[in-house]
Amino acid sequence: MLALKAAYRLVPGDGGEATHRCELLPDDGAGRLLLRDAFEGEANASSVRAESDLAPFKPRCDVLVRATAWAPGEEPAERWTARLRVTGRGAPPPGGDAGGGEPPRRALVDKTLEVCGPRWFERAAEGWQLTRPEPAASVPVRWERAFGGRSLVRAAPGRAPLLDEVCFTNPVGCGWMEARTLDALRDAGAPAPDRVAAPQIERPDSRVTRLAVASHPPHAVEAPQMAEIAADYPFAPAGLGCVGRAWTPRLQRAGTYGEAWVAGRHPFLPDDFSFAYWNAAPDDQQIPHPDVGLRVELWNLARPGLACDGRVAFELPPHRAFAMAWIAGLPVPVPAALDTLSVDAESMVVTCVWRALVARALGVRRMEARFEVDPRAPLLKMAVGRG
């Protein structure tokens, strides 16, 4: 396996559908392969900022967005929407005549998030009441602002917590509570909270209307049971960034590591391992490995001063990454698939990761990473000597 990475700066475009264009950045760090996961805050206890680029294979292309949702015009509002759309070039009409224009584009991702200002679940005699959102000009699109959470009740120093349960679909979010939390707080002699944070990032089909109180078993559960329990959660988290490796449904794709695996497969992957585990994007942000002509559009996901009426749109350049594999003494170009497209709308930087796979049985003695910016150039260029 060979992985290549390139970074582009989004700069204002020259008109047309695209508001911005991609300008290739020099190798100043942004385009270097990431060797370990990077987090927004505490490692393994906050949103993943960017995942390691060392995945062996991704069956689909991850489309990931790191952004802040901005209210239109940067005017504080209680609610607004943000949107991500990714399209590819459509097939030409029969006969090849598109009327002099571009064929209709194919929608690969079209995702809308509902955003609101800070709000809370406040404890009252009749139960937890959801407050009206406070006006806000911006909200970071992080899993901490989406449905999920952790119920942690600490005991005396040096002792195990009285309770430590997480929402299996998003352990770092808010709006979720394990049913034993208030009892555990009372046993610990700790005060119960008067209010808890409510989600600010929602899916249109899963609006959070109440505090989700879930009952987990008092013992540890395996991945299949986690999925069954999570299926009963009343709401689903919403976001645009990496899904944690240990979250449902991604965890279940890692396979089963039981006694049968220890006896028959260890140290290799279990028989039910799915390479889809290596895809980090939410399922609705995974697309087939794209060809040239990919267009990305963002609405209300970039600072208004950098957007055009709240919209940022750009097309990926037709650059090609590939590996030159030397087989039996001859160079053989091996195309690399684009499997990770990351848009950081806060820094206006786009990164792409391509991955090339070559079978070990071919006896490759050497592989070289190559990057071609001329879409018309052949991948293999033969020098002609003059006698």
Q: Model segments located where?
A:
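Extended intrinsically disordered or low-complexity segments
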Residues: 1-387
